[in-house]
Regions:
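A structural signal for multi-pass alpha-helical bundles of membrane permease subunits
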Residues: 2-256
Length: 256
C-alpha cells in the first residue's frame, strides 16, 4: 500500500513538473512557430496553429527587395553577425585580460584606500549609458574613433572592465594563499605564482566572467547604434533597422 502511494505521488510530481516545463517552454515554441509563419498568418487573430510553413522570413533576413523592382539585394546581415562575433570576442578578451590582472593586484597586493578604488571602479558601471553617451560620442568624433572597430572594441572593453574586476577579485579572494606563499619562499616569481598557481584555480571564474561579459556585449544596443556605421554595426541595431519601425513591426522576421 505504501509503495502504491509513493508511485501515485511520483506520477503527480512528474505531471506537475511537465506542466511547469511546458509553461516555460511555450514562449520559445511560439517564437519558433512564428518564424515559419507568413506575414498574414503572423498577424492573424486568433493565432493560427495549423498553417503552411514558409522559409521567407529566414530569406528576408539576408536579402531584401529593391524599391519598385523584383530584384533582391543583400541586407548585409552576415556582416553584422561577423561584427558582433569579432567585436564581442575582442572586447571580452581584453576586459578579461586587464580585469584579471587588476583583480589579482587588488586581491593580493592591496593599496591604501583599496576599497575606495574598488568603489570608484564600480560606480563607473552604475552610470546609465545614456548619461555618458554624449561626451563619449564627442570624444570619439574628435579622435576619429567613431565608426571604427578599434573605437567600439575599446568602448565595450571599458564597459565590461568594472564587472570583470569585481567578479575575478571575488574568485581570487576565495583561494588559499598558503600555496602561493610557499612558492614564493622557494624562489618563485610573482609571474610564476600568478600563471602557474592562481590562474589554474580560477578557470571557472574566467569562464563565468567571459560568458556574462559576452552576453552584455552581444546584447548592447545604444553604443553600437551611435558609435558605429554601416560597416561596423552589430546585430542589435541591425535587427532594429531590418525588422521594422515603431508601428510596423515584422514579427516573423523578429522571431527568425
Amino acid at each position: 500500500m505504501k509503495k502504491k502511494a509513493i508511485g501515485h505521488a511520483g506520477w503527480l510530481w512528474t505531471g506537475l513538473a511537465s506542466i511547469v516545463a511546458f509553461i516555460y517552454f511555450f514562449p520559445v515554441l511560439f517564437i519558433i512557430l512564428t518564424a515559419f509563419r507568413s506575414r498574414m498568418d503572423t498577424l492573424a487573430t486568433p493565432p493560427k496553429w495549423i498553417f503552411t510553413p514558409t522559409f521567407e522570413n529566414f530569406y528576408h533576413i539576408f536579402f531584401r527587395a529593391m524599391a519598385n523592382s523584383t530584384e533582391y539585394v543583400s541586407t548585409g546581415f552576415h556582416v553584422y553577425f561577423f561584427n558582433s562575433i569579432y567585436i564581442s570576442g575582442m572586447s571580452v578578451l581584453l576586459a578579461l585580460l586587464i580585469g584579471t590582472l587588476a583583480a589579482y593586484g587588488f586581491s593580493r597586493h592591496p593599496l591604501r584606500g583599496n576599497d575606495t578604488y574598488l568603489f570608484i571602479i564600480l560606480t563607473t558601471r552604475m552610470l546609465p549609458p545614456i548619461i555618458v553617451i554624449v561626451p563619449i560620442f564627442l570624444i570619439f568624433r574628435i579622435t576619429g574613433l567613431a565608426g571604427t572597430y578599434t573605437g567600439i572594441i575599446l568602448m565595450y572593453t571599458a564597459f565590461n572592465l568594472p564587472f570583470s574586476i569585481w567578479m575575478m577579485k571575488s574568485f581570487f579572494d576565495e583561494l588559499n594563499t598558503e600555496i602561493e606563499d610557499a612558492s614564493r619562499m622557494d624562489g618563485a616569481s610573482e609571474r610564476s605564482v600568478f600563471f602557474g598557481i592562481c590562474i589554474p584555480q580560477v578557470k571557472a571564474g574566467l569562464a563565468a566572467t567571459s560568458v556574462f561579459a559576452l552576453i552584455l556585449t552581444w546584447n548592447e544596443f545604444l553604443f553600437s547604434l551611435l558609435l558605429t556605421n554601416k560597416l561596423t554595426r552589430t546585430m542589435p541595431p541591425a535587427m532594429a533597422r531590418t525588422i521594422g519601425g515603431e508601428i510596423n513591426v515584422d514579427y516573423g522576421l523578429l522571431a527568425a
